[in-house]
A protein has these predicted regions:
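Expand to "…catalyze enediolate/carbanion chemistry for C-C bond making/breaking, isomerization
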Residues: 1-167
């Protein structure tokens, strides 16, 4: 989470030197009351990376809560200090909005975690759109817990998402 007390040490590979990439989360790992603090921390982190570049540091992917937050982050004009963004609750319907705000130089990781993912027609259209419009898509992420929720199911406490029907 962007509220982590050792955010700099983690994202620079000091705390975990074998990391190749890391997600800085502003979504579900951050409580609503802590969002502003998380945003301040993230901006400070990116500014510090600008001042102290480290080519050996892990690639950073930012996970905003929504499109509006992503736009706010992009507007800081620090886009060259991180590798990409994880796009939450991504669907064909919001692809255009994402395209309008995201800089061309970053990689994208759309997260499929809404009920639309159960619609084969939607998925076929999304596949085509990603091929042509989102050529910087690094990978697709699956939001397993959210997909289970769409089915009115919950992951058992003592199991991982990979031990459920989604996994």
């Amino acid at each position: 989470p962007a509220t982590h007390e050792q955010l700099w040490e983690v994202t620079e590979g000091i705390k975990f030197p074998i990391l190749k990439s890391i997600a800085v989360c502003l979504e579900d790992a951050v409580l609503e009351k802590d969002v502003q603090t998380a945003m301040v921390n993230l901006k400070h982190l990116l500014q510090k990376r600008l001042e102290q570049p480290n080519l050996k540091a892990p690639a950073i992917f930012i996970r905003p809560r929504n499109i509006e937050m992503a736009k706010h982050i992009v507007d800081w004009d620090l886009n060259h200090t991180y590798s990409g963004m994880i796009l939450p609750k991504f669907t064909l319907h919001d692809l255009k909005q994402w395209m309008d705000i995201l800089p061309l130089n970053i990689n994208l990781m759309p997260t499929l975690e809404t009920k639309e993912i159960f619609d084969m027609g939607h998925n076929m259209e999304l596949n085509q759109a990603l091929k042509y419009d989102f050529h910087k898509t690094l990978c697709l992420r699956i939001g397993g817990n959210d997909l289970l929720s769409c089915l009115h199911l919950r992951r058992p406490k003592n199991s991982t998402i990979y031990q459920t029907p989604v996994g």
